């Protein structure tokens, strides 16, 4: 005796087969190693706190740099990224957070905020991130970070501007070595931007003091 085939049973079987087929044709997501931006430990300086406050803003950048991809220029004007690796945050956020942390560690500016909090401040450090990538020079490779920094007062008037550019050679082409190179280049650039910001803000604040 044959069992009658119920229409509902056939429908379930067809649905299951379709689901299995869909699963087989969907591409598997490629696993990625997520990297933080390395930093070297710094010692806070013993100095009189600055009488002014600072807001550190995320620098503007191109769509290519404003992503978690680790950018690389293998040749000419070709921009690519390392396969299976990415940053923990987009490059502009990484640099902003590195600068903010550097000011905290330095200790000379104690009233610090970021553009995420949107708090009022005497000065704002921002600008444009023009390069944050590794570049091949023949068989050699180096990390390049280029920041057009801009310091503005609380009326959004530009107080000072300057281009900072760092080239950090990388001995190994492995991603981990390249990431370490980004950390070294960021430390160098951060130290330069920090000192420049303190000098320019202090000079402007002394020339136009508030609450006096």
Which residues fall in each region the model found?
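C-terminal motif of bacterial Sec signal peptides marking the signal peptidase cleavage site
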Residues: 19-22
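Generic short beta-strand segments
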Residues: 59, 128-132, 165-167
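Extracytoplasmic/secreted envelope proteins and their assembly/folding machinery
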Residues: 92, 96-100, 106, 183-186, ...
């Amino acid at each position: 005796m044959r069992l009658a085939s119920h229409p509902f049973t056939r429908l379930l079987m067809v649905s299951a087969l379709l689901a299995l087929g869909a699963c087989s044709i969907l591409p598997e997501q490629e696993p990625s190693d997520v990297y933080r931006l390395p930093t070297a430990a710094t010692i806070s300086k013993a100095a009189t706190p600055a009488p002014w406050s600072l807001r550190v803003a995320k620098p503007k950048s191109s769509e290519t740099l404003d992503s978690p991809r680790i950018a690389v220029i293998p040749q000419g004007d070709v921009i690519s990224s390392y396969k299976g690796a990415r940053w923990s945050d987009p490059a502009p956020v990484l640099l902003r957070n590195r600068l903010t942390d550097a000011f905290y560690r330095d200790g000379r500016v104690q009233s610090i905020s970021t553009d995420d909090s949107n708090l009022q401040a005497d000065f704002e450090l921002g600008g444009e991130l023009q390069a944050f990538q590794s570049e091949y020079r023949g068989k050699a490779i180096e990390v390049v970070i280029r920041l057009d920094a801009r310091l503005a007062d609380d009326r959004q008037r530009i107080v000072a501007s300057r281009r900072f550019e760092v080239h950090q050679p990388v001995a190994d082409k492995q991603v981990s070595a390249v990431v370490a190179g980004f950390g070294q280049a960021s430390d160098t650039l951060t130290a330069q931007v920090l000192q420049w910001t303190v000098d320019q803000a202090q000079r402007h604040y002394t020339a136009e003091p508030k609450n006096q």
